[in-house]
UniProtKB/Swiss-Prot annotation:
Job of this protein: A methylase, recognizes the double-stranded sequence 5'-GRCGYC-3', methylates C-? on both strands, and protects the DNA from cleavage by the HgiEI endonuclease.
Organism superkingdom: Bacteria
EC number: 2.1.1.37
GO biological process, one term: methylation
Entries under InterPro entries matching the protein: C5-Methyltransferase (IPR050390), C5_DNA_meth_AS (IPR018117), C5_MeTfrase (IPR001525), SAM-dependent_MTases_sf (IPR029063)
MF GO annotations: DNA (cytosine-5-)-methyltransferase activity; DNA binding
Listed Gene3D superfamilies: Vaccinia Virus protein VP39
Species this protein is from: Herpetosiphon aurantiacus (Herpetosiphon giganteus)
Keywords associated with the record: DNA-binding, Methyltransferase, Restriction system, S-adenosyl-L-methionine, Transferase
Pfam families listed in its UniProt record: DNA_methylase (PF00145)
Stretches assigned to the SAM-dependent MTase C5-type domain: 1-126
PROSITE patterns the UniProt entry points to: C5_MTASE_1, SAM_MT_C5
Keyword check for Methyltransferase: yes
Name recorded for this polypeptide: Type II methyltransferase M.HgiGI
Length: 126
């Protein structure tokens, strides 16, 4: 199944899905050190892109025609280990993930996050 990994980081989700038999066709992240690590471990492309740039992200992702979108938007604004301040800006990336998914409309979506994200204002908006 053609899969794209958003907020891919160094590739933990990509690796797990590949080992489960999914075809990762591309990944996206916005943090250069993670992208460098990802590139050392996978042969498919990883794109450096801020997913808050929703229109640009949609244009890129559409070129891959994914059947599955996986991703783990940043959790720091929700996590019990953090400040739980949704006003810091990272929480909005969860909404951006939803906007991207709604525009692409893959057959399947898997989003990973901390449990507290479910209780957040952002989750209610999504």
């Amino acid at each position: 199944m053609k899969t794209i990994d958003l907020f891919a980081g160094c590739g933990g989700m990509s690796l797990g899905f590949m080992q489960a038999g999914f075809e990762i066709v591309a990944a996206v992240d916005n943090w250069r050190p993670a992208i460098t690590t990802y590139q050392q471990n996978f042969i498919h492309p990883i794109h450096e892109l801020d997913l808050a740039e929703v229109d640009e992200a949609i244009s890129l992702i559409k070129t891959y025609s994914p059947e599955l979108i996986i991703g783990g938007p940043p959790c720091q604004d929700f996590s019990s280990a953090g400040k739980r301040d949704e006003g810091l800006g990272r929480a909005n990336l969860t909404l951006d993930f939803v906007k991207i998914v709604l525009a692409i409309q893959p057959a399947w979506v898997i989003m990973e996050n901390v449990e507290r994200a479910r209780l957040s204002k952002i989750h209610q908006q999504a």
